[in-house]
C-alpha cells in the first residue's frame, strides 16, 4: 500500500488546523441523558471523516445490529464498559478497546453496565451523520414517523437493520 495522491501541492503549507477545547458543550443530548460531541463533522473535514465523542448515560441505550453501505465506522472505548457487536458476538469493550467495522459490516453498541461510558466514533468518509443522530434522538423522545417515512429516513442515512 502506498500513500494517496497529494491533495495539497503548495510550498509554504497553511495555517488551517481546527482546535476544539475539551469543555465545549455537547451538540446533542439524548432522552437517555447521554450526549454527543461532534469533534469533527464530515462538513468540517471536507468529507474526509467524522469523529464524535459519545457519552452514554447509565441507562441502557444503543442501536440494534445494522450495517452501512457507504461508510466504515470505528469505535474506541474511553471509559466504562460498552457492549460492542462485531457481527458475530457481543464483546465487553473496556477502556482502550477498539473495533473497526468496514463498509457492509454488521455492528452495534450498547451500554447495559448501569454506569456511564464514553467512546469515540470515527466514520469515513465524512457523511452528514448529525441529522441521523439528532432525528433518532427526537424519535426516542416521542417523534413518530410513518413506516414509509421511517424506511426512507434509514435508507437516506445509510442504515440497514439486521
Predicted regions and their residues:
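Short, conserved beta-strand element in jelly-roll/cupin
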Residues: 53-57, 67-86, 122-124
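Long, hydrophobic/aromatic N-terminal blocks
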Residues: 1-40
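Short acidic-glycine-tyrosine-enriched beta hairpin
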Residues: 21, 88-106
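Acidic/histidine-enriched, glycine/proline-rich intrinsically disordered or flexible terminal extensions
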Residues: 130-162
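Ligand-binding loop in jelly-roll beta-barrel domains
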Residues: 83, 103-130
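A short glycine-rich, His/Asp/Glu-containing loop-to-beta-strand
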Residues: 25-65, 71-72
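Short, charged/polar surface micro-motifs in flexible loops or helix N-caps
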Residues: 44-47, 57-61, 81-83, 90, ...
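Hydrophobic small-molecule pocket/channel-lining residues, especially in calycin-type beta-barrels
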Residues: 62, 68-69, 82, 98, ...
Amino acid at each position: 500500500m502506498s500513500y494517496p495522491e497529494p491533495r495539497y501541492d503548495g510550498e509554504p503549507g497553511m495555517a488551517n488546523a481546527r482546535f476544539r477545547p475539551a469543555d465545549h458543550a455537547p451538540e446533542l443530548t439524548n432522552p437517555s441523558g447521554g450526549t454527543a460531541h461532534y469533534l469533527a463533522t464530515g462538513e468540517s473535514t471536507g468529507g474526509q471523516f467524522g469523529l464524535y465523542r459519545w457519552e452514554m448515560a447509565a441507562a441502557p441505550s444503543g442501536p440494534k445490529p445494522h450495517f452501512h453501505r457507504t461508510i466504515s465506522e470505528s469505535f474506541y472505548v474511553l471509559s466504562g464498559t460498552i457492549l460492542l457487536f462485531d457481527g458475530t458476538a457481543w464483546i465487553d469493550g473496556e477502556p482502550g478497546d477498539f473495533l473497526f467495522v468496514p463498509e457492509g459490516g454488521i455492528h452495534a453498541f450498547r451500554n447495559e453496565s448501569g454506569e456511564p461510558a464514553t467512546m469515540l466514533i470515527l466514520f469515513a468518509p465524512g457523511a452528514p451523520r448529525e441529522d441521523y443522530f439528532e432525528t433518532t434522538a427526537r424519535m426516542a423522545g416521542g417523534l413518530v414517523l410513518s413506516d414509509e417515512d421511517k424506511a426512507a429516513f434509514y435508507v437516506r442515512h445509510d442504515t440497514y437493520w439486521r
